C-alpha cells in the first residue's frame, strides 16, 4: 500500500502547474482503489475456523439464507417463550441489514458471543487476532452492545498480561471476556473479573461466565454436576449431558445457586446449524445414508454436519431435542452454528446454489 508520504516525495520532482491535473487523477484513482481494498473480504471466526465475509458497507443484497436463519431463531423464541434466554454464538451479522441494525430481529435474542475477538486467531492458541479481523468483528459488536445487548467474548489464551489487557478492553467496550485454556471448551479456568456473591437475575448483571461444552474429563454426570455446583460463576454456558445422560431437573435447579449462595443463570448449548452424530437424536441409519437435509461434514469438526436448517424435518429434530432441555429446566439456550448460513450464501454467490 502506498502511503501519503510516498506521494509527497514524488510530488517534489513534478511541475505542479503542468502536471497537477494528472496527479489529481492518479491520487483519486489510488485512494478509490485503497478504499475498495479496505472494504474487501474480512475474516470472522466460525466455530473454530475462519470464514471470509464482506464488510457491512458491501453486504450482499441477497440475504435469503441469512433471513432463513433469523426466522429459525424467531421460531425457537416463539416456542420457548419470553422467559427463556437466547444467546447466539458468533454470526453477529445476523443483527444487521443493509449496514444498519435490524430492528425487527434485534429484540429476538438476549445476548451474543464472539470467539477469538482478541486471542485464538485461526485456531492458534495464544495467537493475537489479526487487526483487520478484530476491527471487523468490533464493527459488528460495538453497535450491538451500545444498544444494550450483552456481549460475551471467548478468547483462547493464557497469561496475566492478557487478562489485564482484556480487563481494560472490557472497561471500554462493556463486553464480558474470558480466557479459555483450550479450544475444545472442556477445561476449567478462573474468571478474569473474579467471583462475586451477587444475585444474577439477568444477563446484563453477568461479570463472569463458565463455558464448558465437553465434559468428557468427568467420570459421569454426577461428578460433572458436583463440580458445577461447587463453582461461583455468574453464568453457566454448558453442555447439560454426559455420554447421553442428562442432568436432572433437580440438579439444574441446584445449579442456579452459586456455591456462595448467590443466584445465577444456567444456559444449555444447542447447535441449530449443524447436526452432531454424538447427540441422542442421531439415528444409526444416518451414518450410512444422510437425510436429505444434511449437506456435508464440517471439515474442521468431525461428526458435525452442515444442515439445511430451514428444512422442516431438521426443525422437528431440534424441537424435540429442545423439549428435552425444557424438561430439565434450563434458563435458556446458547444457539451455536447460527453462522452456517455463510456456507449456503457463498455457494449461491459462486453460482452453485444448493437445492432446497
What are these regions (language model features)?
Residues 19-27:
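Sec-dependent N-terminal signal peptides
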Residues 35-356:
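Glycan-processing catalytic domains of CAZymes
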Residues 2, 12, 16-19:
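Positively charged n-region of N-terminal signal peptides that target proteins for export
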Amino acid at each position: 500500500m502506498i502511503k501519503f508520504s510516498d506521494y509527497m516525495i514524488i510530488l517534489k520532482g513534478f511541475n505542479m502547474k503542468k502536471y497537477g491535473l494528472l496527479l489529481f487523477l492518479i491520487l483519486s484513482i489510488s485512494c478509490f482503489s485503497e478504499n475498495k481494498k479496505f472494504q474487501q473480504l474480512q475474516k470472522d471466526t466460525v466455530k473454530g475456523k475462519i470464514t471470509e465475509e464482506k464488510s457491512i458497507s458491501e453486504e450482499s443484497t441477497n440475504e435469503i439464507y441469512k433471513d432463513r436463519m433469523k426466522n429459525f431463531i424467531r421460531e425457537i423464541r416463539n416456542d420457548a417463550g419470553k422467559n427463556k434466554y437466547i444467546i447466539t454464538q458468533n454470526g453477529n451479522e445476523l443483527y444487521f441489514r443493509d449496514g444498519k441494525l435490524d430492528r425487527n430481529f434485534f429484540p429476538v435474542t438476549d445476548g451474543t458471543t464472539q470467539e477469538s475477538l482478541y486471542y485464538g486467531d485461526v485456531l492458534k492458541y495464544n495467537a493475537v487476532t489479526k487487526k483487520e479481523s478484530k476491527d471487523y468483528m468490533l464493527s459488528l459488536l460495538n453497535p450491538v452492545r451500545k444498544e444494550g445487548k450483552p456481549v460475551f467474548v471467548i478468547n483462547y489464551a493464557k497469561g496475566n498480561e492478557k487478562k489485564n489487557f482484556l480487563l481494560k478492553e472490557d472497561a471500554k467496550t462493556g463486553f464480558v471476556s474470558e480466557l479459555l485454556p483450550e479450544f475444545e471448551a472442556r477445561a476449567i479456568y478462573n474468571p478474569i473479573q473474579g467471583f462475586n456473591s451477587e444475585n444474577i437475575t439477568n444477563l446484563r448483571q453477568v461479570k463472569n461466565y463458565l463455558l464448558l461444552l465437553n465434559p468428557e474429563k468427568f467420570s459421569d454426570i454426577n461428578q460433572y454436576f458436583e463440580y458445577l455446583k461447587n463453582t461461583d460463576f455468574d453464568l453457566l454456558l454448558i453442555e447439560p449431558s454426559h455420554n447421553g445422560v442428562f442432568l436432572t431437573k433437580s440438579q439444574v435447579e441446584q445449579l442456579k445457586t452459586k456455591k456462595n449462595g448467590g443466584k445465577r443463570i444456567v444456559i444449555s448449548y444447542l447447535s441449530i446449524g449443524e447436526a452432531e452424530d454424538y447427540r441422542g437424536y442421531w439415528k444409526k441409519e444416518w451414518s450410512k445414508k444422510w437425510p436429505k437435509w444434511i449437506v456435508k461434514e464440517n471439515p474442521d469438526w468431525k461428526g458435525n454436519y452442515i444442515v439445511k436448517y430451514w428444512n422442516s424435518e431438521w426443525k422437528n429434530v431440534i424441537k424435540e431435542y429442545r423439549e428435552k432441555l425444557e424438561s430439565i429446566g434450563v434458563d435458556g439456550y446458547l444457539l451455536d452454528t447460527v453462522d452456517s448460513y455463510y456456507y449456503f450464501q457463498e455457494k449461491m454467490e459462486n453460482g452453485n446454489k444448493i437445492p432446497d
